[in-house]
Swiss-Prot record:
Keywords: Cell membrane, Membrane, Transmembrane, Transmembrane helix. The gene is yxzK. This is Putative integral membrane protein YxzK. The chain crosses the membrane at residues 3-23, 35-55, 58-78, 89-109. InterPro entries: LrgA/CidA.
Length: 134
């Protein structure tokens, strides 16, 4: 039963991909259709049109295979050592800086979400206390 649920959830994600591809081709956008599909999925999740539970297991399944997708890219880089030797320092600087920026952005985002969660908990505690006193 879980296998069928994962397959259906992956199909839902694939539908978002296909819709994104169609929009990209229809409007000749300079952005990949897969990115358009991800933005549509993000909007639908944010507006709660699509609940997370509908895609959670399928997305987790796909994420478990994500490292395998980096192997062909790294093999391609290894096949062209002249690019690495010529632009190696620039690549290293770019990777290090982008990693630092990503870590900082993730830290700020997690702190913001934690503050919102604490405020929500405080409001719930306050409303329970007020309702008990009435």
């Amino acid at each position: 039963m879980k296998v069928i649920r994962i397959i259906l959830q992956v199909l839902i994600l694939y539908v978002f991909f296909m819709i994104g591809e169609a929009i990209q081709h229809l409007f000749h956008l300079p952005v990949s259709g897969s990115i358009v599909g991800l933005v549509l999925l993000l909007i639908c999740l944010g507006l709660r049109i699509v609940p997370v539970s509908i895609i959670e297991d399928g997305a987790g399944f796909l994420l478990s295979f994500l490292p395998l997708l980096f192997i062909p890219a790294m093999t391609g880089v290894i096949n062209y050592p002249s690019l690495i030797s010529f632009n190696g320092l620039m690549l290293l600087i770019t990777v290090v800086l982008s990693t630092i920026v990503t870590i900082i952005a993730a830290g700020f985002a997690s702190q913001l979400l934690e503050k919102k969660a604490k405020k929500r908990e405080e409001k719930e505690k306050c409303s329970k206390h007020v309702s008990r006193s009435l």
